[in-house]
């Protein structure tokens, strides 16, 4: 299995039927709210280093996590803070992963033009005047791989760590068979 680095996991949970963002911002120190900038409320945690965004529809979005335990802990932490100030929260809150961003370094320089030609043209996009990498879509895994000439690969769009690892492993195998 490929040794990938998780850069960010984004997840959400429906923690309430509705949240009075203004009321929460008045009662909860440390929660940031500026209705002119953003309709939601933000709280940043230091351990783990994540941000939780709260929305009027009762959704909580967690971003910045490096692992699934950090997401679970962070959402529970915010739920507990909300309960302590009298906010009605659902008794059971499921967490759904929306996106995992992971990276891997092949450790060698890559010729993106050659790779683009060798891979399925329908699944690749290279416009180096607009973006310095090759965009390769793996629809079967829901993954998009950003491939850079430095050999760094960034995988986005997956909802499981195994899928990120599998997508990068498939790409590594394809690149290793190319005569470039």
Language model region names:
Residues 1-144, 150-152, 158-180:
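Intrinsically disordered, low-complexity polar/charged tails and linkers
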């Amino acid at each position: 299995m490929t040794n990938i680095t998780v850069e960010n996991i984004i997840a959400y949970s429906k923690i309430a039927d509705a949240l009075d963002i203004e009321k929460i911002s008045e009662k909860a120190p440390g929660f940031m709210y500026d209705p002119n900038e953003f309709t939601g409320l933000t709280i940043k945690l230091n351990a783990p280093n994540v941000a939780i965004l709260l929305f009027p529809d009762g959704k909580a979005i967690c971003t910045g996590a490096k692992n699934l335990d950090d997401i679970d802990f962070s959402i529970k932490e915010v739920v507990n803070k909300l309960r302590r100030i009298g906010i009605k929260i659902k008794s059971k809150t499921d967490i759904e992963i929306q996106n995992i961003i992971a990276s891997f370094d092949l450790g060698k320089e890559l010729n993106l033009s050659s790779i683009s030609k060798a891979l399925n043209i329908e699944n690749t996009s290279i416009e180096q005047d607009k973006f310095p990498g090759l965009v390769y879509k793996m629809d079967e895994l829901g993954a998009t791989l950003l491939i850079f000439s430095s050999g760094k690969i960034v995988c986005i769009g997956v909802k499981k760590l195994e899928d990120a690892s599998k997508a990068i492993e498939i790409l590594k195998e394809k690149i290793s068979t190319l005569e470039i």
